[in-house]
Regions:
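Short, well-ordered alpha-helices that flank and scaffold nucleotide-derived cofactor binding pockets
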Residues: 35, 39, 116, 215
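Predominantly flavin-linked oxidoreductase catalytic cores and closely associated redox partners
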Residues: 125-246
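N-terminal FAD cofactor-binding segment of flavoenzymes
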Residues: 49-90
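N-terminal Rossmann-like dinucleotide/flavin-binding domain of flavoprotein oxidoreductases
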Residues: 81, 85-91, 106-125
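Short beta-strand to alpha-helix junction loop
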Residues: 97-116, 229-237
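N-terminal Rossmann-like FAD-binding beta1-loop-alpha1 element of flavoenzymes
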Residues: 19-45, 49
Length: 250
């Protein structure tokens, strides 16, 4: 979940507090990294600072992933599915995943657990400050925020920078974007064991477009209209597509 850019430098005494690790971003990847460092015998005594701009992260997203058998996050799962369906105008295929499941967890339960675990390690700090930049000084890294300046030996950056993609001309840049609704039907219609992974029966409009349906009960589901394209749509376009899809399915 997420990605890291790593800078490894030697330590240096300076007027700034010297930290072993700074992690930019306290979302899924940043918290996961801090959690793993805290559990490691080699790094659990290291000084770690997590810099996160948003102090009020809640149920701001869901994460789904494939896993075989039982997993570390099973107690946090909102649901899991043992079958997935792929559908187009010419194909309708449902795959039994066997020992593998497609699992879903909500971000709040994940954030809460990892914050609790990380808080048990007194060498870890979380500060809610927006990073404005960082620079590699050869034997340390300087990190600037809107409030302070920090120094570390190793910096992990999980903050996505659009400029890196925009500045390159070698490859076209396609975005994966979507809008989802939680829906409830008056009568049972969903197979709770089956996730509709990609339903390409919606109009493609010379792009890659599909519906993604995750049922929680026979009457409750998350439905998302998903695209791979260069530009985002207006909110009304996503919602109109979902309405049309629901009308078609009665």
């Amino acid at each position: 979940m997420g990605f890291y850019i790593l800078y490894v430098c030697a330590s240096e005494n300076d007027r700034l507090q010297q930290l072993d690790f700074i992690i930019l971003g306290g979302g899924a990847s940043g918290l996961q990294l801090a959690h793993r460092l805290c559990k490691s015998d080699a790094y659990k005594a290291s000084s770690i600072l997590i810099l996160e701009s948003d102090q009020h992260k809640a149920n701001d997203r869901t994460w789904c992933f494939w896993e075989t058998g039982e997993g570390e996050w099973d107690d946090l799962l909102q649901n899991q599915w043992s079958k997935v369906q792929f559908k187009s105008q010419s194909i309708d295929k449902t795959i039994d995943l066997g020992d593998t499941s497609y699992k879903m967890l909500r971000s709040k339960s994940y954030y809460d657990l990892l914050h609790k675990n990380i808080a048990q390690n007194k060498s870890v700090q979380i500060k809610y400050e927006r990073c404005t930049g960082f620079s590699d000084k050869g034997n340390h890294v300087i990190v600037n925020t809107e409030q302070n300046t920090y120094q570390c030996s190793t910096l992990f950056n999980s903050i996505f920078d659009w400029n890196i993609l925009r500045q390159q001309q070698q490859y076209p840049v396609l975005q994966q974007h979507f809008l989802g609704w939680y829906i409830k039907t008056p009568t049972p219609v969903f197979d709770v064991q089956k996730a509709v992974f990609m339903d390409f029966t919606v109009p493609q409009k010379q792009e890659t477009r599909f519906m993604y349906v995750l049922p929680f009960t026979k009457t409750d589901a998350l439905i998302e209209y998903t695209l791979f394209s260069e530009k985002l749509l207006d909110k009304s376009e996503y919602e109109s597509a979902i309405r049309d899809y629901l009308k078609e399915k009665n």
